[in-house]
Regions:
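S-adenosyl-L-methionine-dependent DNA methyltransferase catalytic core
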Residues: 4-16, 21, 26-177
Length: 177
């Protein structure tokens, strides 16, 4: 990609950025490619301080409808395979392809399609539509107008908003805008 952009006359900068470093409780590493038609001084944004980042506690809803909770059999199965039985709540657990369950204080990257990396909050329930949006850094003013499955797909395909905002701000600085 870089070679093609440079062949078209762009000055290209590329770096892997993690959404965790820009304020959302999601480990989502993505390569970000920025190109300019003129030579400019550009630097990717620095990560924000840890104490300014949102945590799961910040984004989780307090009252969640019963439809988001999993069957007792799923909950019991996951809890029996949980690696750390004393992990403090709230956590998001991730089931890998081997069936191992690992809790984390952040989400793995949300996925658009089927994935072995099935996430549950406290091994009890699926994230709500609003929580998925918050994990991606969308403001609460963002309207939910599609069903759960489509929202999950859209959030899985999205980039983390704070990452792109920070990169865009750096681009504007480089262009003196």
């Amino acid at each position: 990609i870089r070679e093609h952009l440079e062949a078209l006359g762009y000055y290209v900068f590329a770096k892997v950025l993690n959404a965790l470093d820009y304020g959302v409780p999601q480990k989502r590493e993505r390569i970000i490619i920025v190109g300019f038609l003129e030579p400019v001084l550009f630097a990717f944004p620095d990560p924000i301080p840890i104490n300014k980042r949102k945590t799961l506690t910040d984004i989780l809803e307090k009252d969640v409808a019963a439809k988001y909770y999993v069957k007792d059999s799923i909950k019991e199965s996951r809890l029996s395979r949980l690696k750390d039985k004393n992990y403090p709540k709230p956590y998001i657990s991730h089931e890998n392809m081997a069936g191992s369950i690992t809790p984390h204080p952040y989400s793995s990257a949300l996925r658009a399609g089927a994935s072995a990396n099935y996430i549950l909050i406290n091994d009890e329930r699926r994230p709500t539509e609003r929580e998925m949006l918050r994990i991606q850094g969308f403001p609460d003013t963002f309207k939910i107008v599609v069903p759960y499955g489509k929202m999950k797909h859209q959030c899985g395909n999205s980039v983390a908003v704070p990452v792109i905002k920070a990169v865009a701000e750096q681009m504007m600085l480089s262009l003196n805008i």
